[in-house]
C-alpha cells in the first residue's frame, strides 16, 4: 500500500536544545529516525523542520525536507503546513513519526498506515499493554480506553480504567485492562485539514493531549495493539544516554 511518512523535527526543545541533531553513535538523531522510516516501505518520507541545520543534516543523508514555520503550537499543525505545501489529496495516508524516536520499529510505522487504510476513519494510532504499576500510575505514560470495536473512548494521563476492586486491595499490581498510548498517528490528509480548523478543546488543555480534540468534536480514532514495542524515546539528557547505550 502507498503511504507518506512525515517526521516533525522542531529544533528548540525546552528540555534538550537542538534535539534533532544530538549525536547518537556517530549520527544525528533525526537521521536514525529517517532510517527507521525508510525500512517501513513508505512511498515518500518528509522531515518537517523549522531550522536550517536540521535540514542540512537530513539532506546530507539523502532525505527530503519541508521547511515550516517556527510558531506552530503542535506537531499536527506542522503536519498541516506540509500537507498544504505538498498538495496531498484528501485521501493520502499520512503517518506522523516523532522525530525523537530513533528506536521506533519500522513494522509499527507500516502497521498504523495499514490499519487506517482498512477503515473508514480519519485517524488511527497504536497502544501497548501496561504490566507495571509504576507505568500505570505515571502521568507521563498516556493511557487509552477502547470500545468493543477498537476505537478510543478516552485518553488520559490518569490511570484508566480504574480497577476499583484490585486497587482497593493493592496499588502494587495491575491487571490486563490498561493500555499505554504510543505517540504514532496515521491520518488521511483531509482529516488533518479538518483538525486544524477546529478550536482547541477544554479537555486537551487540561490533559495536554492534542488527540482529545478529535474525540471532543465527535470523530473516531482507531487504536490497535502494536506489533512491536518501541524503544526509549529522547526527551531528556538522561534519555539520550540510555538510547546511546541501547543502540551501541
Curated annotation (Swiss-Prot):
NCBIfam families: kdsB, PRK05450.1-3, PRK05450.1-5, PRK13368.1. This is 3-deoxy-manno-octulosonate cytidylyltransferase. It catalyses: 3-deoxy-alpha-D-manno-oct-2-ulosonate + CTP = CMP-3-deoxy-beta-D-manno-octulosonate + diphosphate. SUPFAM superfamilies: Nucleotide-diphospho-sugar transferases (SSF53448). GO terms for biological process: CMP-keto-3-deoxy-D-manno-octulosonic acid biosynthetic process; lipopolysaccharide biosynthetic process. It is found in: Cytoplasm. Its EC number is 2.7.7.38. Disulfide bonds: none annotated. One of its GO terms (molecular function) is 3-deoxy-manno-octulosonate cytidylyltransferase activity. Pathway: Nucleotide-sugar biosynthesis; CMP-3-deoxy-D-manno-octulosonate biosynthesis; CMP-3-deoxy-D-manno-octulosonate from 3-deoxy-D-manno-octulosonate and CTP: step 1/1; Bacterial outer membrane biogenesis; lipopolysaccharide biosynthesis. Keywords: Cytoplasm, Lipopolysaccharide biosynthesis, Nucleotidyltransferase, Transferase. HAMAP family: KdsB. Its main location: cytoplasm. It comes from Salmonella paratyphi A (strain AKU_12601). One of its GO terms (cellular component) is cytosol. Signal peptide: none annotated. Activates KDO (a required 8-carbon sugar) for incorporation into bacterial lipopolysaccharide in Gram-negative bacteria.
